[in-house]
Each structure stands twice: as C-alpha cells, then as structure tokens.
Amino acid sequence: MTRIAKERGTDNVLADLGLPDAEELTAKAILAKKINDIIESRGLTQSAAAKRLKIPQPKVSAIRTYKLTGISLERLMQALTALGQHVEIIVRPCDRNTPARINVAA
C-alpha cells in the first residue's frame, strides 16, 4: 500500500492557494456575505439596496456575486453601517508563537 503524504493547510484556503492578498480577500468575502444576508433578509432588490447604500446598482451586483475587485474594505464597512450595522475594528498584540494576521468576524 502506498502512503500519500498530507500537507496540513491553514484556516484560510486562499492563503493555502498562495494568493498574496488572501487575508484581505477573505475579509472582503466575509463582509460581503454579511451584506448579502441583510439584503436577502430585508427582501431588498439590487436597486433598493443601491439607494440605501448610496452606491451604483452595478456595485451592488458585484457584491451580490462576490466579484469584489475594485471594492475596498472601507466601502464594504460603509455599506454595513448604511444597513444599520455596527462595525468595530480591534487591534491587539499577537501571541509570540502565532504570526500576525487579519481576522474578520461577522
């Protein structure tokens, strides 16, 4: 029987794929997911969401389909506040044995 070597990944599949901006992409996807959940729960059309978020409808479409190139983390956070969400950023020292990272919880 042949043994197959397994390589342990991280908790970020985008980093495991070697993407240089994996943490930012993951953060954007998490924020977009929260925005999409709110849009769906409120039954908003893309047009209605665009008015509420004060962004063009094509940007809402991009968020809805997770095509987040050209949409900043700041813009996503502003969208969440426009939807009545509190966005909090906490900076704290990391443990000695753990590399520093960006983490988003939504």
Question: Can you describe what each PLM-predicted range is?
Answer:
Residues R64:
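DNA major-groove recognition helix of helix-turn-helix
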Residues L73-I90:
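DNA major-groove recognition helix of helix-turn-helix/homeodomain DNA-binding modules
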Residues G43-S61:
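Short alpha-helical DNA-recognition segment
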Residues I39-S41:
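Short amphipathic helical patch at the helix-1/turn junction of helix-turn-helix
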Residues M1-K33, C94-V104:
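N-terminal flexible/basic segments that precede or flank functional cores
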Residues K67-L73:
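Short, solvent-exposed alpha-helical "recognition" segments
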Residues Q57, L68, N97-T98:
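Short secondary-structure boundary/hinge segments and terminal tails
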